Amino acid sequence: MSYSIYKSTVNIPLSHGVVHSFCHNMNCNFMHIFKFVLDFNMKNVTEVTLFVLKGFTDNLELQTIFFFLFLAIYLFTLMGNLGLILVVIRDSQLHKPMYYFLSMLSSVDACYSSVITPNMLVDFTTKNKVISFLGCVAQVFLACSFGTTECFLLAAMAYDRYVAIYNPLLYSVSMSPRVYMPLINASYVAGILHATIHTVATFSLSFCGANEIRRVFCDIPPLLAISYSDTHTNQLLLFYFVGSIELVTILIVLISYGLILLAILKMYSAEGRRKVFSTCGAHLTGVSIYYGTILFMYVRPSSSYASDHDMIVSIFYTIVIPLLNPVIYSLRNKDVKDSMKKMFGKNQVINKVYFHTKK
């Protein structure tokens, strides 16, 4: 529309005197502004309707290897997380807040991985690695939502562990349904709200011409890197929102495990101290990897958003961590292992792989 208006305007016969008077009085500022608007609107004609995902490599042999590798990871992720949920549902002895948190974490991890991995597997088998605009919007929203929810669930689980170890006699009272259910619901609500803010802010930007995302899935930093609009506000939103969520949840985790450490030191049983140290150490390792990669990806200068190293780092918090969480939080737990043996013990393959026992 702007271009047609411009053509109709410049085709009107204008006398030299009128033009000279106009430029003299206005210093031709209007024409410069109008030219800028015209150029902007002409560039907007090529609005992006799909995005190209860069992927790991164009080598067909490597793509085949990556396909089977990530397919195996995805299947084990689903089996581990969905298996844990099934165990918690079926075993009445696991109907406790701690295991409800674990089952919620497993559901988030299964969904988180399912948002990213299937599309990535399809890209390994096709030459054109593309995703539609709406598909990219959905992937950003869901990934951000599940990622944020996991941050809050990890903090809630750390607090739950503190209550269970510091004062086990009052655990059922301190973590009653009136306490743990709001914590779980608040985690999901926070994830949805946080994802909504960033999704709306990101896709309110203009994407013209450049549409190659240097990642294996749609994510906010690489989208900001290719946007035609000013992304300063988006970068501030990303820095302050993600930074605040990370800071609050990390503090809760550190304070909870710090108090757990004090409680451990008061234990008289050396064997009890060793078991709790081992379990808490594994938990902190998983939490550190997850929070560390999130901080690296989102709370940093925007000039390095398109780094190729980001592709590797993003795999950890979207694909590797959902695979490791069932092992870190569940298979090291005696109650969960006993329950899984009852349910899957007759299966010789599972019995040998997970429990290292012979029939």
UniProtKB/Swiss-Prot annotation:
Positions of transmembrane segments: 65-85, 94-114, 139-159, 179-199, 236-256, 277-297, 311-331
Subcellular location: Cell membrane
Keyword Transmembrane helix: yes
Cytoplasmic side: 86-93, 160-178, 257-276, 332-359
GO CC terms in record: plasma membrane
Keywords: Cell membrane, G-protein coupled receptor, Glycoprotein, Membrane, Olfaction, Receptor, Sensory transduction, Transducer, Transmembrane, Transmembrane helix
Gene Ontology BP annotations: G protein-coupled receptor signaling pathway; sensory perception of smell
Glycosylation sites: 44
Residue intervals annotated with topology Extracellular: 1-64, 115-138, 200-235, 298-310
Membrane disposition: Multi-pass membrane protein
GO molecular function annotation: G protein-coupled receptor activity; odorant binding; olfactory receptor activity
Main location: membrane
InterPro entries with a match to the protein in the record: GPCR_Rhodpsn, GPCR_Rhodpsn_7TM, Olfact_rcpt
General function of this protein: Odorant receptor.
Family: Belongs to the G-protein coupled receptor 1 family.
Protein name according to UniProt: Olfactory receptor 5T2
The species this protein was found in: Homo sapiens (Human)
